[in-house]
Amino acid sequence: HAIMCAEKAINSPFAVINADDYYGREAFKIMNGHLSGLDANSTEHAMVGYILENTMSKAGSVSRGVCEIKDGYLESMKENTKIYYEGSKVITELDGEKKELSGKEWVSMNLFGFSQKAFETFHAYWDDFVANNITSEKAEALLPAAASQIVTDGKGKIKFYSSPEKWFGMTYPEDREIVKQEIAAKI
């Protein structure tokens, strides 16, 4: 929804990030390198993914788009809205069932790069989302789902770039001290 609100102001390939996440310097360099070579009609978009265990919070569950990658491109992405530590194990709950993850899975942290061509899919995704959730008070249009639709609809590809960096962000109030320490260490 936020991307669509900004559509009229976007006149070149663009990146999307979450405001409360730290992605690391290299991730931005990677994305800049990809976007610098795109034109407005390119159908090759990009994302920077992270290793799941580098994106977890000790304070509670997180939501992550777990990625399947093939030949350097996103093949699919499944949003897991409840991933958490249970002791030393990484657990996800999908469709009411607990499943252990390795922690080595590639996940989306919503660092995407798109050409303006992506808006065609975003509009279709949004229209379907609104039509199917018109009475829901809790439904959320998720960027990973909209990005995945580009791939599943055959409207483009999403080049997958990996980041070995440790993500940090403000998922829970308890994360504040860790974030302060991480930022101070980078200054």
Residue ranges and their predicted role:
Residues 1-13:
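Short phosphate-binding loop-to-helix
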Residues 4, 29, 148:
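Active-site phosphate/pyrophosphate- and oxyanion-stabilizing loops and adjacent acidic/basic residues
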Residues 6, 20, 51, 115, ...:
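Residue-level signal for inorganic ion chemistry
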Residues 12-13, 43-44, 156:
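Short coil/turn segments at beta-strand junctions that form active-site/ligand-binding loops
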Residues 70, 77, 84-187:
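Conserved alpha/beta core of the MobA/IspD/sugar-nucleotide pyrophosphorylase nucleotidyltransferase superfamily
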Residues 25-112, 116:
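Conserved core of the sugar-phosphate nucleotidyltransferase
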Residues 12-22:
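Short beta-strand-to-loop acidic/aromatic patch adjacent to the donor-nucleotide binding site
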